[in-house]
Amino acid sequence: MAFNLRNRNFLKLLDFTPREIQYMIDLAIDLKKAKYGGYERKHLTGKNIALIFEKTSTRTRCAFEVAAFDQGAQVSYLGPSGSQIGHKESMKDTARVLGRMYDGIEYRGYGQEIVEELGAYAGVPVWNGLTNEFHPTQILADFMTMLEHGKGKRLDQIKFAYLGDARNNMGNSLMVGAAKMGMDIRLVAPKAFWPEEDLVAKCRLIAEETGARITLTEDVKEGVLGADFLYTDVWVSMGEAKEAWDQRVKLMTPYQVNMDVINATKNPDVKFMHCLPAFHNDETTMGKEVADKYGMKGLEVTEDVFESEHSIVFDEAENRMHTIKAVMVATLGD
């Protein structure tokens, strides 16, 4: 391997150099080609992996399970009600137990400090499947997808805008990733929903070294002009109370990704991205609740954008598996 990432934790992109991040993306691209070409080699044969999910999941769980199986590993799924973590046993103790039984551990849950503690005490590679603050595996998939659809541009030649709640784990993680990789990111959101100032300051310092361009703006037209990609996420994050909806919908409606926003980029080839799940119609229980309460069939993105030729959300979702596989192979593989 070009880089020795063996036995490293994957907790947040702040812990990695641009070259290490690019290596994992390149490895994911190679692994994807190998899977499609029928010549994939197993690098995790005989490995046992624990998947801790304190929050529910579709893409992250399936991506970890399929990636592990493809590479010859076995997994144990510990769901929100399937363990003693946090109830009868501390994460510190859990880490020291699971680290004796498993070769690698994935964690999806709440505070970043929890996965950091798990990583500090497990003694085996720990991978962050999502916390309230960061979602690093998603960013690898996003950047891989941008490379696939970027018409030959390197990451440091790509401009993209993130619209909506920019203080959540996706806003944080995209900003960190863009800073590391020298990209042009525009965080387009109400000022109250910009990332924490200390994280912005860290990213601006990184940007001084990488040439990244970080813009925080409330102006949608300014933020999206010339963008290669538009990105959004749900307006109310996992675990937030439903009572937050009323104020959030009122504040965020101007930042909805609709065809007017697509056209405002002045880029006919602009692509739309979303980490999913998305509220783009009224065909789900929550989507119907939103439609009934607010008279909107889509929230952060409209149906016509989501289903348009601009949308690459399902390529992006697939790449979760390939990039997660790359992280596991890089940190645990033979």
UniProtKB/Swiss-Prot annotation:
The keyword Amino-acid biosynthesis applies. Pathway: Amino-acid biosynthesis; L-arginine biosynthesis; L-arginine from L-ornithine and carbamoyl phosphate: step 1/3. GO terms for biological process: arginine biosynthetic process via ornithine; citrulline biosynthetic process; L-arginine biosynthetic process. GO terms for cellular component: cytoplasm. It catalyses: carbamoyl phosphate + L-ornithine = L-citrulline + phosphate + H(+). SUPFAM superfamilies: Aspartate/ornithine carbamoyltransferase. Disulfide bonds: none annotated. Pfam families: OTCace, OTCace_N. It is an enzyme of class 2 (transferase). PROSITE patterns: CARBAMOYLTRANSFERASE. It is found in: Cytoplasm. The keyword Kinase does not apply. GO terms for molecular function: amino acid binding; ornithine carbamoyltransferase activity. NCBIfam families: orni_carb_tr, PRK04284.1. PANTHER family: ORNITHINE CARBAMOYLTRANSFERASE, ORNITHINE CARBAMOYLTRANSFERASE, MITOCHONDRIAL. Reversibly catalyzes the transfer of the carbamoyl group from carbamoyl phosphate (CP) to the N(epsilon) atom of ornithine (ORN) to produce L-citrulline. This is Ornithine carbamoyltransferase.
